[in-house]
Structure formats: C-alpha cells, structure tokens
Amino acid sequence: MATYFVGDIQGCFDELHVLLAKVDFNPSKDELWVVGDMVARGTQSLETLRYLKGLEGSVKPVLGNHDLHLMALHGKVKRVNPKDNLGALLAAPDLNQLIDWLRLQPLAREHKAHSVLMAHAGIPPQWDVKTVLKESRKVQEALARDDYIEHLIAKMYTNSVSEWSPETKGLKRLVYTINALTRMRFLHSDGRLNFDCKLPPAKGEKEGLIPWFKQPGRAMKGHTLVFGHWAALMGEVNQPGLQALDTGCCWGQYLTLWHLESNQKITQNKLKKS
C-alpha cells in the first residue's frame, strides 16, 4: 500500500491522470489524499470530481475555498465567474450527486499512523490537533444539514471573522474555521487572519505580515502539516514538518504528488493543449 498526497488540482484532470500513472497508483490498495481546491480555473473540473468520487474509500479529500464556492454557485447564492471554467460541471446531470459527495468531506484530516495532518490552507497557530479536528467536524456537520446553503454557505463570505477565541459560538465560530482552514496565508502580528496578501512570504513580511507557519509558539507539535492553497510558495517552505503542495498547475506550472512512505515528491508539468 502506498499513500499519496496531491496538491491543488483545480480541474487539471489530464495532469492528475498522467501523474498517477507515473506512480502506478492502484486504488484497490493505495490511498490518494487530496489537499482541496479540486475544482475551478482548470478546464476539467467535472472529470476531476467524477474521478475522485469514483475512487470511493481510496480517496481522502479535504475541502478548499473553491470547493466551498462551488456549493455557493450550486445554491445560487453567488454568480458564476467565467474564469473559473465551471460551466460543464454546473450543467452536468450528476451535479447534485457530486455536490452531495463534496458535502461529506471535512476541512481537515489526520493520518494517525504517520502523524500527518492535512488542511487546505494551513492550521491556525493557536490550534492543536484535537482542536483542528473538532472544529473541522463542526463545519462538516453543518454542511451535512438539509439547509446547509441557508445555514452556512450563504453566510460564510465575510472578512470580519479573522480572530480566534475559544468563547466564540455558533455561525461566527464556523466561519472562522472556514476562513482559517481554507483561506489563510498571512497573519497580522496579533494573530488575526489577513485575507488580502497573496505574495510570497518574503514580500508579505516586508509589509509587516507573518506567514501562518512562521508564527512563534504554534500549538501544533509532533505532526507533519500538509497544505496547498498558496501557489506563490511553489512548494518551498524550508521548514521541517511542513509539506506545501500547491505548485500552480492551473497557472501553467505543475502538479505535485507527495509519496508519504518514501518522502519523495513527483511532479507533472502543465500539459499543452493541442
């Protein structure tokens, strides 16, 4: 059995297919952990979701911000941006089934045997493993509700919830979890989430911001953290215990696969379309 973690696919299905062929991925015995943002930007979001859903128990995804945004488009609380290339997916006859499958997925997963924790954007520095999984579970339960659109999706679009407090309750707590686990890159010096800066770490630091993984005193100990979301990193964090897997395939760069057992990375360049 082999365990693979893949970075932001974002509808780059052909590249995913070639990458998995390189490692002879066998869903009957191997596992594919997906770091979120399975859809949008690339042209094959429909094929990507159908394939991942079809892997059944062999796939272990977490949700990214684009996956949650797809739910908002499906629920008609947001308008479609043509740049997202989601037309075929939104018109698919099995869209409802694909959305229902997405709604079952968490925002964070733990591989206990190897002490690995995965979330799309990263882990707030105040949270330990227990807190991450507990707060992720609350969002997962909210997404499983019949009224999940009105209860959560329609209300999650806000930058005003940027500060963690254990006393925060209800919707605000759910929104903080979504913002932290699917949108976070930089923090302000007081620990608040910054939603505007998407620059590489060195440039953001010149503006007084702190990459979330450089915040002193992080509560997470003893786990390797796997994340995507931040294409400007191009997989380079130069810090032990971190695996950054978003390498900008949908922007013309490449898709990255991390083989857990050997600690090796395999990549596939963006394919040129004929």
Curated annotation (Swiss-Prot):
<dbReference type="InterPro" id="IPR004617">
    <property type="entry name" value="ApaH"/>
</dbReference>
<protein>
    <recommendedName>
        <fullName>Bis(5'-nucleosyl)-tetraphosphatase, symmetrical</fullName>
        <ecNumber>3.6.1.41</ecNumber>
    </recommendedName>
</protein>
<keyword id="KW-0378">Hydrolase</keyword>
<dbReference type="GO" id="GO:0008803">
    <property type="term" value="F:bis(5'-nucleosyl)-tetraphosphatase (symmetrical) activity"/>
</dbReference>
<dbReference type="InterPro" id="IPR029052">
    <property type="entry name" value="Metallo-depent_PP-like"/>
</dbReference>
<dbReference type="InterPro" id="IPR004843">
    <property type="entry name" value="Calcineurin-like_PHP_ApaH"/>
</dbReference>
<comment type="function">
    <text>Hydrolyzes diadenosine 5',5'''-P1,P4-tetraphosphate to yield ADP.</text>
</comment>
<dbReference type="Pfam" id="PF00149">
    <property type="entry name" value="Metallophos"/>
</dbReference>
<comment type="similarity">
    <text>Belongs to the Ap4A hydrolase family.</text>
</comment>
